[in-house]
């Protein structure tokens, strides 16, 4: 089973450690943590951990900035993960597929050490000859190691690395002139030429066109959804936003934002959530007053499993013959 996950920074600023890597996330950042990566965080922000059996994302850990416009869309995705959905939504997985790739690290040790230095400080202006002298090899040898191992010459690799870092900075609303300086280009025109060569567009078009790690565009609307579930232990359902209807044998309740409904163990439950609405399962015994995403995330850290098992609709008809017809939810 894949234990890779997505970490959504819903608010504040959080430092997330993945092994030897540290990522500083701000509200609107989404981080991919690959399989086998253990994570911890410090800071005052709120991280929502999205666990799916199927992510459709691979490669190293990486961060993209979606912005606050994606906040409710990602809370919806968090809700899907808590309900036990198998796979992350395709549009979310595609965000990582579209990103500007980091140039590969060279395998030979001298070139690899140089590449790691440049990755840590893209603005480093050390020349190929100076790096070669530091490593005790010829400039020709170092150049050959870059070309044979990555397909890039030394200068091309450095430019590709700078462009990759620049896309992340542009996504965090730094100006093009500031970004050019931060990643080591002498002028914005140099950054523009590198952008055209490596990703086929200009920095200004990148920040307005929804390409890769730039602006992610407008998220898809949250659809209505019907979930058929069997509760293995007592559970509650909290309406984060919008409306929903919970139907169990002999019982039907219409819920609005902030409401909480109890789903007893052994109950077969139909949950109809209106378009634009989000319902989140929470452990039993938590009151409606003061419920928040922060509280949900804390509780789920302590008790990851919700105790809800999804049931196929065809099997549901057999399990819950006595269900009342569900009242159609009304969008707010």
Swiss-Prot record:
Domain (HTH araC/xylS-type): residue spans on this chain: 112-209
SMART domains xref list: HTH_ARAC (SM00342)
Family annotation (Gene3D superfamilies): Homeodomain-like
Domain of life: Bacteria
Gene Ontology MF annotations: DNA-binding transcription factor activity; sequence-specific DNA binding
UniProt KW Transport keyword: no
InterPro entries hit by this protein: Homeodomain-like_sf, HTH_AraC, HTH_AraC-typ_CS
Gene Ontology BP, a term: regulation of DNA-templated transcription
Keywords, sorted A to Z: DNA-binding, Repressor, Transcription, Transcription regulation
Pfam families (UniProt xref): HTH_18 (PF12833)
Upregulating conditions: Repressed by DtxR under iron excess.
DNA-binding region location: 129-150, 176-199
Function in brief: Under iron limitation, represses the acn (aconitase), catA (catechol 1,2 dioxygenase), leuCD (isopropylmalate dehydratase), narKGHJI (nitrite/nitrate transporter and nitrate reductase), sdhCAB (succinate dehydrogenase), pta (phosphotransacetylase) and katA (catalase) genes.
Protein name from the UniProt record: HTH-type transcriptional regulator RipA
Organism: Corynebacterium efficiens (strain DSM 44549 / YS-314 / AJ 12310 / JCM 11189 / NBRC 100395)
């Amino acid at each position: 089973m894949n234990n890779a996950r997505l970490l959504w920074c819903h608010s504040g600023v959080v430092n997330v450690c993945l092994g030897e890597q540290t990522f500083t996330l701000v509200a609107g950042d989404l981080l991919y943590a690959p399989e086998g990566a253990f994570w911890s965080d410090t800071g005052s922000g709120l991280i929502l951990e999205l666990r799916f059996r199927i992510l459709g994302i691979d490669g190293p850990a990486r961060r993209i900035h979606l912005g606050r416009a994606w906040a409710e869309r990602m809370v919806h995705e968090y809700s899907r993960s808590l309900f036990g959905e198998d796979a992350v939504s395709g549009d979310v997985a595609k965000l990582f597929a579209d990103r500007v790739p980091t140039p590969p690290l060279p395998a030979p040790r001298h070139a690899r050490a140089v590449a790691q230095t440049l990755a840590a400080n893209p603005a480093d202006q050390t020349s190929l000859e100076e790096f070669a002298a530091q490593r005790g090899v010829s400039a020709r040898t170092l150049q050959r190691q870059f070309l044979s191992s990555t397909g890039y010459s030394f200068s091309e690799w450095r430019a590709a690395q700078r462009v990759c870092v620049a896309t992340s900075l542009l996504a965090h609303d730094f100006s093009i002139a500031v970004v050019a300086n931060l990643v080591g280009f002498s002028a914005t025109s140099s950054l523009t030429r590198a952008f055209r060569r490596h990703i086929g567009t200009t920095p200004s078009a990148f920040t307005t066109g929804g390409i890769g790690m730039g602006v992610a565009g407008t998220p898809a609307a949250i659809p209505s959804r019907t979930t058929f579930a069997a509760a293995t232990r007592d559970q509650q359902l909290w309406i984060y936003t919008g409306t929903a209807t919970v139907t169990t044998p002999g019982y039907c309740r219409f819920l609005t934002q902030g409401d909480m409904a109890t789903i007893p163990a052994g109950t077969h439950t139909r949950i109809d959530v209106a378009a634009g609405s989000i319902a989140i399962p929470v452990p039993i015994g938590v009151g409606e007053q003061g419920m928040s995403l922060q509280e949900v995330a804390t509780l789920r850290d302590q008790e990851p499993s919700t105790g809800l098992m999804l049931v196929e609709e065809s099997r549901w008809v057999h399990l819950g013959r006595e269900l009342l017809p569900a009242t159609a939810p009304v969008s707010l």
